[in-house]
Amino acid sequence: MSNNYPHPLLAREGWPFIAIALAVALVINGAAGFGWALPFWLLFIFVVQFFRDPPRPIPQGAKDVLSPADGRIVAIEPVRDPYLDRDSVKISVFMNVFNVHSNRSPVDGEVVARWYNAGRFVNAALDKASVENERNALHLRTRDGHDVTCVQVAGLIARRILCYVEAGASLARGQRYGFIRFGSRVDVYLPAGSRARVTIGDKVSASSTILAELP
């Protein structure tokens, strides 16, 4: 296992929110005392924990598909991949507001294509979120020629999908490529014949949990 890239322990996406929460807590603490400022210190602590982005051990098995997000497994099913029009195995991870919201590549590979779809903002724990909600999809191709589709899905509260790569980019497994704020979902479509290594309800960690094994 290895950690293949450096990054701050607090996600850059959260720095403005952390700074504002800290400033408000300090101002109220100075003006009115700790008692009045306590709710704002608690808010500051919540914001810090929300935007935490810890390094993770990264399994290096050639056929391993890693979880792209922290959260809970809400779907494992054979479906038609709507992006590549093929039979596939779909595994979905639901992220609540207490999970780390950094998204990381499930495999080593090249970004073949990227698609953005505008949509609704229904509860991301529901299956219909995969086809109705705002979403951003990446088509990744591994060195062995396997195609993996990784889809960031906005949720009821999360209405900001951030993706930092385009077609032609190379991603290492576990590499950070995006972020979704305040609860959301990530769907992974794998080649037919892939074997799931998780079950419904399992808690998973981005980069360190093995979701499945490629054929």
From Swiss-Prot:
Localization of this protein: Cell membrane
A single Gene Ontology CC term: plasma membrane
InterPro entries xref list: PS_Dcarbxylase (IPR003817), PSD-A (IPR033175)
GO process annotations (BP): phosphatidylethanolamine biosynthetic process
Keyword NADP: no
EC number: 4.1.1.65
Pathways involved: Phospholipid metabolism; phosphatidylethanolamine biosynthesis; phosphatidylethanolamine from CDP-diacylglycerol: step 2/2
Homology family: Belongs to the phosphatidylserine decarboxylase family. PSD-A subfamily.
Entry-linked NCBIfam families: PRK05305.1-2 (NF003678), PRK05305.1-5 (NF003680)
Role, per record: Catalyzes the formation of phosphatidylethanolamine (PtdEtn) from phosphatidylserine (PtdSer).
Full protein name: Phosphatidylserine decarboxylase proenzyme
Organism this protein belongs to: Aromatoleum aromaticum (strain DSM 19018 / LMG 30748 / EbN1) (Azoarcus sp. (strain EbN1))
